[in-house]
């Protein structure tokens, strides 16, 4: 498992073409067909929409990838009632040992350890005490590891993005359908307290008919990108040398898509991408990185701010932004608007960090704090496990809420909140932004990963209150 990004030829060619296309301006407004059309289902292959998990008395989790993200999530999995971590794996065997030590020191059973080679995860997947595989490796390995988990008969929770190519996204959909196992994007931001309250308010009609949303991942990662220890072998920085794309738009896009019932009555139809020049990383390097650092051999080609404008079948728009190269405070933007009002997150010093303006409650063109509405629309998950989340999870507790809910779904035998079709759709801007940028920002079609089932209204993150099953 090399730590060098295995960027495809398509991504590289797309980046090269983008340079020339952007110089000549945007072409025809007619959307360009996606490179891979919806493949036909094989005989016997069926949709996974509405398919519940088989009930599990205990959920046994194996973890692939024990760097910053995976290593930080293992204790959260172990803290969920009825969940145990049975095996851990990393190409660096010392990480597996440290992860096992950490779990054991907290009173958990010591998990089996795997590591030392690129195929260590395959050996781990031959165990018979795994129900769910959590994958937190570098982006370029997510598809390989997620697919292997499904083929081994396990469900998979995969960090962002689940894949970086359109054909890989389709293959994960098809593999999930053939194996009858679920693959879920580990989109913790969908379980944020503000995001879930926003979703409930939208579904209650507070904002009227929804018209547009704006989300992003705006996070100054420059210091971490140039760190010699944070991202193993600098894998994340190297993506900026090999492709021009919106690498990580899901944190901002997914909560907006969920509030708009994408794949549950609406769907994303077209995407057009724009990018700024790549300035931030080179400027940071010039000011703060010694001349003998390996990064001085690199040329950064990904724009600092990559913006995707997405249209839906119902005529809504979503703007999804990605910028990890600029000096700025953290923001996911998280803004949703409709015919009767708007909520805007990351917008001031109010306790919730969000502000709202809705008719007929407000007037005078004056924002109000979101706090009253968050209390009214507080999701049952936060009411039930919010205190535990504060003690066991990162990112304000939403990591643990995601973990708790995933385990609950599996133990109770319920339908997942986020399915493989959501996961594929929310991650599709990664490859589609490459295509759009390579064609001068022209719109490209977004595939319908549900193969027509998006018109069916069905529950998602707006779930009914449910108790965690008692211990067996």
From Swiss-Prot:
PROSITE patterns: TAT. The keyword Nucleus does not apply. Its cofactor is NAD(+). Gene3D superfamilies: Dihydrodipicolinate Reductase, domain 2, NAD(P)-binding Rossmann-like Domain. The keyword S-adenosyl-L-methionine does not apply. Predicted to be exported by the Tat system. The position of the signal peptide cleavage has not been experimentally proven. NAD(+) binds at residues 68-69, 90, 139-142, 145, 159-160, 188, 248. Binds 1 NAD(+) per subunit. The NAD(+) cannot dissociate. Residues 1-35 form the signal peptide. Substrate binds at residues 217, 236, 248-251, 330. It holds the Pfam family GFO_IDH_MocA. It is an enzyme of class 3 (hydrolase). Keywords: Glycosidase, Hydrolase, NAD, Signal. One of its GO terms (molecular function) is nucleotide binding. Its EC number is 3.2.1.-. It comes from the Bacteria. Belongs to the Gfo/Idh/MocA family. Glycosyl hydrolase 109 subfamily. Glycosidase. Has no alpha-N-acetylgalactosaminidase activity. This is Glycosyl hydrolase family 109 protein. It comes from Streptomyces coelicolor (strain ATCC BAA-471 / A3(2) / M145). The lineage of its organism: Bacteria, Bacillati, Actinomycetota, Actinomycetes, Kitasatosporales.
């Amino acid at each position: 498992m090399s730590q060098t990004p295995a960027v495809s030829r398509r991504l590289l060619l797309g980046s090269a073409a983008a340079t020339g296309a952007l110089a000549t301006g945007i072409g025809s407004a007619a959307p360009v067909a996606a490179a891979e059309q919806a493949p036909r289902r094989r005989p016997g292959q069926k949709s996974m929409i509405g398919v519940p998990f088989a009930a599990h008395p205990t959920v046994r989790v194996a973890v692939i990838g024990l760097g910053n993200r995976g290593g930080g999530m293992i204790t959260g999995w172990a803290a969920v009632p009825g969940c145990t971590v049975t095996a851990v794996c990393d190409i660096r065997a010392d990480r597996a040992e440290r992860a096992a030590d950490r779990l054991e020191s907290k009173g958990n059973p010591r998990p089996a350890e795997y590591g030392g080679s690129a195929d260590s995860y395959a050996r781990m997947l031959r165990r018979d005490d795994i129900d769910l595989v959590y994958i937190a490796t570098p982006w370029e390995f997510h598809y390989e590891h997620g697919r292997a988990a499904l083929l081994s008969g396990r469900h998979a929770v995969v960090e962002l993005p689940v894949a970086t190519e359109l054909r890989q996204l389709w293959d994960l959909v098809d593999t999930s359908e053939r194996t009858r196992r679920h693959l879920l994007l580990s989109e913790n931001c969908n379980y944020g307290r503000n995001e879930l309250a926003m979703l409930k308010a939208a579904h209650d009609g507070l904002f009227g008919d929804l018209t547009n949303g704006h989300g992003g991942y705006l996070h100054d990662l420059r210091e971490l990108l140039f760190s010699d220890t944070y991202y193993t072998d600098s894998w994340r920085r190297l993506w900026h040398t090999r492709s021009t794309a919106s690498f990580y738009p899901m944190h901002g896009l997914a909560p907006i898509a969920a509030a708009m019932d994408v794949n549950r009555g609406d769907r994303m139809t077209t995407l057009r991408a724009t990018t700024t020049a790549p300035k931030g990383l080179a400027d940071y390097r010039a000011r703060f990185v010694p001349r003998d650092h390996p990064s001085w051999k690199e040329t950064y080609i990904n724009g600092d701010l990559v913006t995707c404008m997405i249209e839906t079948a119902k005529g809504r728009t979503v703007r999804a932004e990605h910028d990890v190269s600029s000096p700025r405070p953290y923001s996911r933007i998280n803004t949703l608007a409709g015919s009767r009002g708007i909520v805007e997150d990351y917008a001031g010093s109010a306790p919730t960090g969000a502000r709202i303006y809705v008719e007929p409650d407000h007037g005078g063109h004056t924002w109000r704090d979101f706090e009253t509405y968050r209390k009214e629309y507080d999701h049952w998950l936060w009411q039930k496990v919010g205190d535990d989340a504060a003690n066991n999870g990162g990112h304000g507790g939403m990591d643990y809420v995601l973990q708790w809910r995933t385990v609950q779904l599996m133990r109770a035998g319920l339908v997942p909140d986020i399915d493989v079709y959501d996961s594929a759709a929310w991650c599709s801007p990664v490859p589609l932004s490459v295509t759009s940028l390579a064609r001068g920002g022209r719109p490209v079609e977004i595939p319908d990963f549900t193969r027509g089932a998006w018109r069916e209204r069905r529950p998602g993150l707006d779930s009914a209150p449910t108790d965690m099953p008692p211990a067996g």
